[in-house]
Amino acid sequence: MRLDRRELAGALADIGVLVPIAVALIVGNGLSATAVLLPAGLLYLTAAAVYRLPVPVQPLKAFGAIAIAKGLGSDEIAAGALLMGVIFIVLGRLGLLDLAARGFPRALIRGVQLTVGLLFLKIAWGLVTDPPKSFSEHALSADWALPLALVTLVLAFALRDYPITLALVAVGAIVTVVLAGGEAAFGPSALALPSLDTATIVTAFTVLVVPQVPLSFANSCLATADAAKVYFGDQGSRVRPGRLATTFGSANLFAGAVSGMPVCHGAGGLTAHYAFGARTGGAPLAMGGLLLALAIGLGTSLAELLTAFPLPILAGVLATAGVLHILLLRDLRGARAWAFALFVGVVGFELNLTVALGIGLALWWGAEGLRRLPRLRPAA
């Protein structure tokens, strides 16, 4: 484990997903800023200790998007986090995810990673062309934001072997302070236990958990474990699907208990950390420490500060990670593998990842079964 400029630069590389969802949950859904960042910070520290590699922490993307779009309150979000925690701890501890992973061909996992890469690009585009409402006060028009995001993307891509994200985040922090103005209030925001009843739990399960479980299974567990092996070889064997499920499941039990932001791991985040220099557990250690410091030290004023962070910087870094994540497909060999990966990736992006994986698995193993059938031989 090390903590040098490269590790610190890599640690900051995945903020393009974290910041917009966190801000929307704080501003739009009324979650405590401290409760939003605490689970993410603690899971980063856990990842540093357990995996000793730059395993990422992200908000639950489908879960968060639905909660934001529907304006759900902290109780429904907390109930969903608790349910996600229970489901994935059980799946992880029973070894079911490690067993299921053996049935997923590499081509289909690459398809999942293609879906995630495309989603990163879509989110980045939306940040500058249709900014989230919570950022509207300080957002630039698309005429300015889009060129600035493209410049950020080019710089981030070309200089990713240097600590470019440190420079970009430093610029963003200066702009944030200037735009937010005034003096920051120090101290954590209040934490609250959720108030749960049957109706709240049923709503959380049907509206939030059911759409999220397949994505977390495919991306947070299978695709993240695969990406770790690609980037870190034998060291990546510590990053198993079942272990990933257990660590982020445990974090969600805590998130639910404090009415905070549900979190997971993610293959795209691993690419982001790795691409910008992270190679050890030092990156998640640094990021976890930063998030805890912000949650405890600036929780009362964090929402106002984060809404002023420049969206072109978030979009440019996120788009770079998306492009690099799509490049994982380079190791595919043969037309069949490419066809399956592209099918899962495009259908998962345009329609539904669960549907894409279901059809992909059925076609893959159906074809395998036909290939293994004994050929009929003419009678002698």
What does each model-found stretch correspond to?
Residues 31-36, 52-64, 101-108, 262-269, ...:
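Short, non-helical or kinked segments that cap or interrupt transmembrane helices
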Residues 9-10, 44-54, 156-157, 211-215, ...:
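Transmembrane alpha-helix interface/packing and boundary motifs in multi-pass membrane proteins
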Residues 9-71:
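Transmembrane helix-boundary motif of multi-pass solute transporters/channels
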Residues 16-22, 56-63, 221-223, 260-269, ...:
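Transmembrane helix boundary and interhelical junction motifs in multipass membrane proteins
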Residues 2-8, 25-46, 210-281:
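Membrane-embedded helical hairpins/re-entrant loop segments and their flanking transmembrane helices
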Residues 6, 13, 141-149, 162-164, ...:
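Hydrophobic, membrane-embedded alpha-helices of multi-pass small-molecule transporters
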Residues 1-8, 183-195, 229, 233-237, ...:
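Intrinsically disordered, low-complexity non-transmembrane regions of multi-pass membrane transporters
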Residues 71-184, 286-380:
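Membrane-embedded alpha-helical modules
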